[in-house]
């Protein structure tokens, strides 16, 4: 086989296959949680990002890296919290919800509205970094 062979078709087939596997995993995750695929996909992406940040922070703690667990844990948890917002809106609808209707116009429970979402995000992020700063100063 020629070394400089054009492999664009193989790369395209791999990308399409990877997208199909990602769709199937996201659909199964969404069905397991009982939400639509966009809410489940956002939650799954946030979960992967949070686990990646926590894994990177633990790896830096073990290898004496620059960014440790104390620095990345509030960011990882706030990322996970913000990924839950569409699922919380889906679970918190008071009236009947039919797929295709805009969920922003529905009546929501108190824990699914924007004030609780943004307030929880700010509490997790700024409270976490406040605790990290306080424990850093106490050393």
Q: Residues of each region from the PLM?
A:
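Cytosolic juxtamembrane helix and N-cap/initiation of the first transmembrane helix
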Residues: 1-19
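Canonical alpha-helical transmembrane segments
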Residues: 46-71
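Hydrophobic core of alpha-helical transmembrane segments in multi-pass integral membrane proteins
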Residues: 14-25, 50-56, 121-133
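Hydrophobic alpha-helical membrane-insertion segments
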Residues: 69-91
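Transmembrane alpha-helix entry/boundary detector in multi-pass membrane proteins
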Residues: 7-12, 25-49, 114-117
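Membrane-interfacial loop-to-transmembrane alpha-helix junctions, especially the N-terminal start
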Residues: 7-13, 66-74
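Juxtamembrane "helix-exit" motif on the non-cytosolic side of transmembrane helices
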Residues: 23-35, 57-62, 88-92
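Alpha-helical membrane-associated segments of multi-pass integral membrane proteins
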Residues: 97-139
């Amino acid at each position: 086989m020629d070394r400089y062979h054009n492999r664009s078709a193989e790369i395209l087939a791999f990308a399409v296959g990877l997208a199909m596997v990602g769709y199937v995993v996201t659909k199964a995750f969404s069905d397991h949680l009982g939400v639509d695929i966009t809410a489940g996909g956002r939650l799954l992406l946030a979960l992967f990002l949070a686990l990646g940040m926590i894994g990177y922070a633990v790896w830096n703690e073990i290898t004496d890296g620059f960014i440790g667990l104390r620095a990345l844990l509030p960011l990882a948890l706030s990322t996970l919290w913000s990924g839950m917002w569409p699922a919380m809106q889906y679970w918190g609808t008071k009236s009947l919800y039919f797929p295709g209707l805009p969920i922003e116009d529905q009546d929501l429970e108190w824990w699914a509205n924007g004030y609780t979402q943004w307030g929880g995000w700010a509490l997790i992020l700024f409270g976490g970094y406040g605790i990290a700063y306080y424990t850093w100063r106490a050393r």
